[in-house]
Amino acid sequence: MVSYSKNVFVPLTRLCRNRCAYCTFRREPEEVRSPYLSPEEVFEIVEKGKEAGCKEVLFTFGERPEERYDEALEWLEEHGYSSTVEYLVDLCRRCVEEYDMLPHSNPGVITKREMRKLRRWNASMGLMMEILSERLCEESGPHEHSPGKRPEERLKVLKYAGELKVPFTTGILIGIGETWEERVKTLEEIQRMHERYGHVQEVIVQNFRTKPGIPMEDHPEPTPADLLRTVATARLILPDVPVQVPPNLNRETGQLALLAGANDWGGVSPVTKDYVNPEAPWPEIEELKRLTEDVGFRLRERLPIYPEYVRRGWYHANISEVVERLSDDEGFAR
């Protein structure tokens, strides 16, 4: 069985305190009309998602832009918020209360207190480990200008999620200059945390894709064989954790990834594009079904919180009514 979640993607802000060399998502203040999407803009997107049968609202955005840009801080203060996370909590609450949809937030590096607040209104949360390497944070490395990409900062958030019993999505980004040993070490660190807390609901193996205009524009992409070897390795290191491969980044190799050990396609949106990889459109659900069944698997829709964690009751009372309404007896989407 291979799972996926039908979602709507909300790019809350494209300002970010980090400047990763492979990113095409972030913008400078002068490049955007407003530092943040307004509540009206957010819920226009959410409404379209609900009409299309989506159950997940995916909030992905730049990390703590108010620490770097006065424009971001001023916008938040004008709208009655002290931080991006505080604004996000309010939006997540409204997604649940007004739209019967389940948020999944990728807020970047946050404090334990912030995560506790988000947990009240999120079915799950996520933070990629990328590659846990101090070397990549050094001069000329892809994370040189990204304080939020320090390995100890990423691991701290993964630990908080375990302590707070947050169903958590994490993963690795391959092909950004890491060694094979660094790749394996990152997967082993994720497994170590999962063995301790049991909270890692999925691990994404995401391949770097070059894009015009980024500092790593001329950096080679990982080969299909490299991706498949990494998927197989992730399956061996994390035997009990679902492994996800994004289908829009792997149209030619996605089926082979399933045979190598992947068993989840991740979030797929019939409404919004992948703002992180805008050049790579989502496949239609019917195409995804065909790709999955052609190699002998069955496609099944899930919620942003994985079935195991639905069955365990790993969600806050604030969202319990919506989780139970949207899930079946096995914890998958109705």
Swiss-Prot record:
Identify the pathway.
Cofactor biosynthesis; coenzyme F0 biosynthesis
Q: Which Pfam families match?
A: Radical_SAM (PF04055)
Instruction: Name the cofactor(s).
Output: [4Fe-4S] cluster
| All residue ranges annotated as the Radical SAM core domain in the record | 2-248
List ligand-binding residues for [4Fe-4S] cluster.
Answer: C16, C20, C23
Presence of keyword Nucleotidyltransferase: no
Q: Which GO terms describe its biological process?
A: sulfur compound biosynthetic process; water-soluble vitamin biosynthetic process
Q: Does the keyword Aminoacyl-tRNA synthetase apply?
A: no
Q: Coiled-coil stretches, from where to where?
A: none
Quote the CDD domains the UniProt record gives.
Radical_SAM
Q: Which InterPro entries match?
A: Aldolase_TIM (IPR013785), BATS_dom (IPR010722), CofG_family (IPR019939), Elp3/MiaA/NifB-like_rSAM (IPR006638), F420 (IPR034405), rSAM (IPR007197)
Q: Which reaction does it catalyse?
A: 5-amino-5-(4-hydroxybenzyl)-6-(D-ribitylimino)-5,6-dihydrouracil + S-adenosyl-L-methionine = 7,8-didemethyl-8-hydroxy-5-deazariboflavin + 5'-deoxyadenosine + L-methionine + NH4(+) + H(+)
Question: Which controlled-vocabulary keywords does the entry list?
Answer: 4Fe-4S, Iron, Iron-sulfur, Lyase, Metal-binding, S-adenosyl-L-methionine
Bound how, and how many: what does the cofactor note say?
A: Binds 1 [4Fe-4S] cluster. The cluster is coordinated with 3 cysteines and an exchangeable S-adenosyl-L-methionine.
Family annotation (Gene3D superfamilies): Aldolase class I
Q: Name one GO molecular function term.
A: 7,8-didemethyl-8-hydroxy-5-deazariboflavin synthase activity
E.C. number, please?
4.3.1.32
Q: What domain of life? A: Archaea
Assembly notes: Consists of two subunits, CofG and CofH.
UniProt record similarity statement: Belongs to the radical SAM superfamily. CofG family.
Q: What does this protein do?
A: Catalyzes the radical-mediated synthesis of 7,8-didemethyl-8-hydroxy-5-deazariboflavin from 5-amino-5-(4-hydroxybenzyl)-6-(D-ribitylimino)-5,6-dihydrouracil.
Matches recorded under PANTHER family: 7,8-DIDEMETHYL-8-HYDROXY-5-DEAZARIBOFLAVIN SYNTHASE (PTHR43076:SF15), FO SYNTHASE (COFH) (PTHR43076)
Q: This protein is called what?
A: 7,8-didemethyl-8-hydroxy-5-deazariboflavin synthase
